[in-house]
Swiss-Prot record:
Name by which UniProt lists this protein: Nucleoid-associated protein pc0477
Domain of life: Bacteria
Organism classification: Bacteria, Pseudomonadati, Chlamydiota, Chlamydiia, Parachlamydiales
Protein's cellular compartments: Cytoplasm, Nucleoid
InterPro entries noted in UniProt: YbaB-like_sf, YbaB/EbfC
Signal peptide: none
A Pfam family hit: YbaB_DNA_bd
Organism (species): Protochlamydia amoebophila (strain UWE25)
Family: Belongs to the YbaB/EbfC family.
Oligomeric and partner information: Homodimer.
GO cellular component annotations of the record: bacterial nucleoid; cytosol
Length: 98
């Protein structure tokens, strides 16, 4: 077990430390997606879990539930996009959350 093994072991330890830092950053990250000029907002945590959904009463029309569904999907897509933009990069894994 020469220096090559030691070097790989150090590299593995460094990657592990970097991943730990990224995980900590993701735990503290929250993003808000918006649709319909704020009629619907969705908050996602750094690991992609939906934390909160807010729907303003004026956008609820029982005759047009499809419109509300579209707003919810749009707010979720916006939140997911923001999450990808704000997530810390993972060294060696470009586009990890893409």
């Amino acid at each position: 077990m020469g220096t090559g093994f030691s070097k790989k072991k150090k590299e593995a330890r460094l990657i592990q430390q970097q991943m730990s830092l990224v995980q900590n950053e993701l735990q503290n990250l929250e993003v808000v997606g918006v649709a319909g000029s704020g009629l619907v907002t969705i908050t996602l945590t750094g690991d992609g879990e939906m934390k909160q959904v807010k729907i303003k009463p004026e956008c609820v029309d029982v005759e047009d539930l499809e419109g509300l569904e579209m707003l919810i999907r749009a707010a979720h897509a916006d939140a997911h996009k923001r999450l990808k933009e704000q997530s810390p990069p993972i060294p060696g894994f470009p586009g990890f959350l893409a």
